[in-house]
Amino acid sequence: KKRRQRRRAAQAVRLIKFLYQSNPPPSPEGTRQARRNRRRRWRQRQRQIRSISGWIISNYLGRPAEPVPLQLPPLERLTLDCNEDCGTSGTQGVGSPQILVESPTILESGTKE
């Protein structure tokens, strides 16, 4: 089953790569208006390719192309807890996030420089 998943992922990547390669950036020749029109059409094709790529990913791999957004409390209530090794090399991003929902006094105290 894993081999089949890898093969389908490789197919999806090849298809998406082919789509992007089939739409090279527009040439810089011609009048300003012609260049503008070519760029506009190129951007429109890029948007279509992006949506088709999302469809390919969701159908080939069985998952949405975009990650589900993380629900956070209002910004005013978020503070960072740096009491423990904040950003020690090798440990960044490891473990559970240290987000506390408290008063914003910690953020205000760091404004002096």
UniProtKB/Swiss-Prot annotation:
Its main location: host cell. A motif (Nuclear localization signal and RNA-binding (RRE)) lies at residues 31-47. Residues 33-45 have a biased composition (Basic residues). InterPro entries: REV_protein. The modification Phosphoserine is found at residues 89, 96. It is found in: Host nucleus, Host nucleolus; Host cytoplasm. Residues 17-45, 89-113 are annotated as: Disordered. The RNA-binding motif binds to the RRE, a 240 bp stem-and-loop structure present in incompletely spliced viral pre-mRNAs. This region also contains the NLS which mediates nuclear localization via KPNB1 binding and, when the N-terminal sequence is present, nucleolar targeting. These overlapping functions prevent Rev bound to RRE from undesirable return to the nucleus. When Rev binds the RRE, the NLS becomes masked while the NES remains accessible. The leucine-rich NES mediates binding to human XPO1. HIV-1 lineages are divided in three main groups, M (for Major), O (for Outlier), and N (for New, or Non-M, Non-O). The vast majority of strains found worldwide belong to the group M. Group O seems to be endemic to and largely confined to Cameroon and neighboring countries in West Central Africa, where these viruses represent a small minority of HIV-1 strains. The group N is represented by a limited number of isolates from Cameroonian persons. The group M is further subdivided in 9 clades or subtypes (A to D, F to H, J and K). This is Protein Rev. It comes from Human immunodeficiency virus type 1 group M subtype B (isolate JH32).
